[in-house]
């Protein structure tokens, strides 16, 4: 059966359906990459908190700690376990973005996802170019921080949105070629790509986090979690913001804001598979369109126009005939007269 072109809205709704129909598997797959980052940072903060609280008594007990270099070294050492967990989880999160792309064929055929380890291994085997691609992405993100480049980088972000899909489905391309390929695919489809980016951005970065945060507030979960981190918040230095014309911010507000930020970040990361599915489907759609356009152009080049056919027939008929020598002789005699 011939494949029908899908509209951006059709792809958006299908991506949502595929994500939520495999929600339990995606939650399980993303749990360590997402919660591992939170656990790693939490461990760093927790150990640092107890370290600073007990530092005076430790210095009294162990005179060797009464040295600046020793304190710095010890401060670094106590954060290493948490940092190790965070880095491992963060790397797995980056790999998951590429791995979920390669699961698309199975999802479209059966509606299910499976064999996560095999798809993850496909990306890890290409870790060097994968890191190179993320390095380019990091440079672009740093440039985008500058307000002078917001408009330009915002436009380029639309054109470069498919770089990781290109990396997954066209493994022969280098990171720089992936960027160029994404730009070529989106070219001519900017409005549709921007619409998809806006839709999935609003859903996964705004609506879902805000709905869950609202439910947490109503259930008192935000207050409960805020109270748990109050001992750490209380260690923050007091700053008189009123002298700068800024209203005073209470410690409770800081704790609530911290919890809401963490909850929103967790939900945004858990919806990574939805974004990955959507952009993989959009890549396939644009890639198929580009292939058909190239095929049509090639056929047109092979099909000769009527004038070209007429010229070719004329050349075949007269091109190889020799000019009569008598004609040349008569022409030269006329020139002499």
Regions flagged by a language model, labelled:
Residues 72-77, 81-82, 114, 118-142:
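Alpha-helical membrane-spanning segments of integral membrane proteins, especially the hydrophobic core
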Residues 15, 90, 94, 138-159, ...:
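Hydrophobic, aromatic-rich membrane-embedded alpha-helical segments
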Residues 25-51, 88-91, 136-140, 195-211:
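Hydrophobic alpha-helical transmembrane segments of multi-pass membrane transport/permease proteins
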Residues 83-91, 147-151, 259-271:
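Hydrophobic alpha-helical transmembrane segments of multi-pass membrane proteins
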Residues 2-3, 14, 51, 55-62, ...:
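Juxtamembrane transition segments at transmembrane-helix termini in multipass membrane proteins
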């Amino acid at each position: 059966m011939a494949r029908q072109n899908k509209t951006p809205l059709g792809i958006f709704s299908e991506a949502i359906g595929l994500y939520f129909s495999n929600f339990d598997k995606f939650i399980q797959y993303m749990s360590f990459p997402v919660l591992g980052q939170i656990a790693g940072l939490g461990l760093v903060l927790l150990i640092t908190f107890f370290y600073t609280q007990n530092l005076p008594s430790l210095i009294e007990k162990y005179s060797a700690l009464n040295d600046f270099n020793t304190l710095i070294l010890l401060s670094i050492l106590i954060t290493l376990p948490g940092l190790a967990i965070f880095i491992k989880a963060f790397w797995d999160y980056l790999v998951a973005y590429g791995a979920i792309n390669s699961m698309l064929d199975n999802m479209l055929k059966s509606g299910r996802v499976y064999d996560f380890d095999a798809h993850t291994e496909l990306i890890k085997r290409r870790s060097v170019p994968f890191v190179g691609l993320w390095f380019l992405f990091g440079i672009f993100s740093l440039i985008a921080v500058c307000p002078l480049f917001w408009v330009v980088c915002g436009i380029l972000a639309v054109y470069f949105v498919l770089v990781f899909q290109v990396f997954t489905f066209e493994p022969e391309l280098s990171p720089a070629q992936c960027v160029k390929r994404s730009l070529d695919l989106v070219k001519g489809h900017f409005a549709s790509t921007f619409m998809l980016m806006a839709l999935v951005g609003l859903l996964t970065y705004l609506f879902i986090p805000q709905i869950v945060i609202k439910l947490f507030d109503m259930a008192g979960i935000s207050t409960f979690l805020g109270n748990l981190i109050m001992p750490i918040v209380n260690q923050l230095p007091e700053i008189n913001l009123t002298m700068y014309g800024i209203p005073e911010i209470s410690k409770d507000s800081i704790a609530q804001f911290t919890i809401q930020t963490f909850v929103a970040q967790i939900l945004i990361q858990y919806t990574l598979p939805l974004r990955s599915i959507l952009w993989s489907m959009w890549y396939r759609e644009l890639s198929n369109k580009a292939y058909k356009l190239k095929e049509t152009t090639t056929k047109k080049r092979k099909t000769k126009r009527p004038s070209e056919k007429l010229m070719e027939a004329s050349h075949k008929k007269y091109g190889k005939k020799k000019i009569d020598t008598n004609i040349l002789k008569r022409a030269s005699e006329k020139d002499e007269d």
